């Protein structure tokens, strides 16, 4: 590489000027700030470890001048492994580029995958999802706003995705044979079949519930098809009856003649 690239003029020219990169001051009442992920204990400038994973259950003050945060920051943060939920109360601070030592305050920033809540009023906050259910008993709900409580409720009430059990051909055959014998087997019969096909009794019970629902649907559809066929036969016979009457009348006239 040429030595001219490391000259003093080139190094100074690459630095941004403060006059050219002044940013507007953000309002004090900022919208929620949503970050996609926070790892370890970066908000407090502490090293990650086993103690940081579980010690973050309890609210602690944010250290001034933390990693990437302005000095005028106060509040608390709650965390569990890589999941965090808490509040940061940010005051408006002088804004400027990194070369002047000033850090822009947390404003109306938002991740593109999370919509901004409308009508939000209050201090700047940090909301990172999802929130594990183990954290809920340790959270200070009184400090959360109405919008944050609604989002937290949605995350907490979200149903977990169930894993679908894949049955082998032998298991399906044994289950189907028992279903043909009885649609509602008792607990002892289910346990006996579960030991035979190497399944849990809960799985056998769920399979029978689903199989009965399928059987009802098939029975309902077959009855509807039979009813539709009967209606079609009645309508077709009613349409053909006048023609038959005309043919019978003609045959009677021919016999009289």
From Swiss-Prot:
<dbReference type="GO" id="GO:0014036">
    <property type="term" value="P:neural crest cell fate specification"/>
</dbReference>
<feature type="compositionally biased region" description="Basic and acidic residues">
    <location>
        <begin position="241"/>
        <end position="257"/>
    </location>
</feature>
<keyword id="KW-0217">Developmental protein</keyword>
<feature type="region of interest" description="Disordered">
    <location>
        <begin position="213"/>
        <end position="257"/>
    </location>
</feature>
<dbReference type="GO" id="GO:0005634">
    <property type="term" value="C:nucleus"/>
</dbReference>
<protein>
    <recommendedName>
        <fullName>Homeobox protein goosecoid</fullName>
    </recommendedName>
</protein>
<dbReference type="GO" id="GO:0000981">
    <property type="term" value="F:DNA-binding transcription factor activity, RNA polymerase II-specific"/>
</dbReference>
<comment type="function">
    <text>Regulates chordin (CHRD). May play a role in spatial programing within discrete embryonic fields or lineage compartments during organogenesis. In concert with NKX3-2, plays a role in defining the structural components of the middle ear; required for the development of the entire tympanic ring. Probably involved in the regulatory networks that define neural crest cell fate specification and determine mesoderm cell lineages in mammals.</text>
</comment>
<feature type="DNA-binding region" description="Homeobox">
    <location>
        <begin position="160"/>
        <end position="219"/>
    </location>
</feature>
<comment type="similarity">
    <text>Belongs to the paired homeobox family. Bicoid subfamily.</text>
</comment>
<dbReference type="InterPro" id="IPR009057">
    <property type="entry name" value="Homeodomain-like_sf"/>
</dbReference>
<dbReference type="InterPro" id="IPR051440">
    <property type="entry name" value="Goosecoid-like_HB"/>
</dbReference>
<keyword id="KW-0371">Homeobox</keyword>
<dbReference type="InterPro" id="IPR017970">
    <property type="entry name" value="Homeobox_CS"/>
</dbReference>
<keyword id="KW-0238">DNA-binding</keyword>
<dbReference type="Pfam" id="PF00046">
    <property type="entry name" value="Homeodomain"/>
</dbReference>
<dbReference type="GO" id="GO:0042474">
    <property type="term" value="P:middle ear morphogenesis"/>
</dbReference>
<dbReference type="InterPro" id="IPR001356">
    <property type="entry name" value="HD"/>
</dbReference>
<keyword id="KW-0539">Nucleus</keyword>
<dbReference type="GO" id="GO:0000978">
    <property type="term" value="F:RNA polymerase II cis-regulatory region sequence-specific DNA binding"/>
</dbReference>
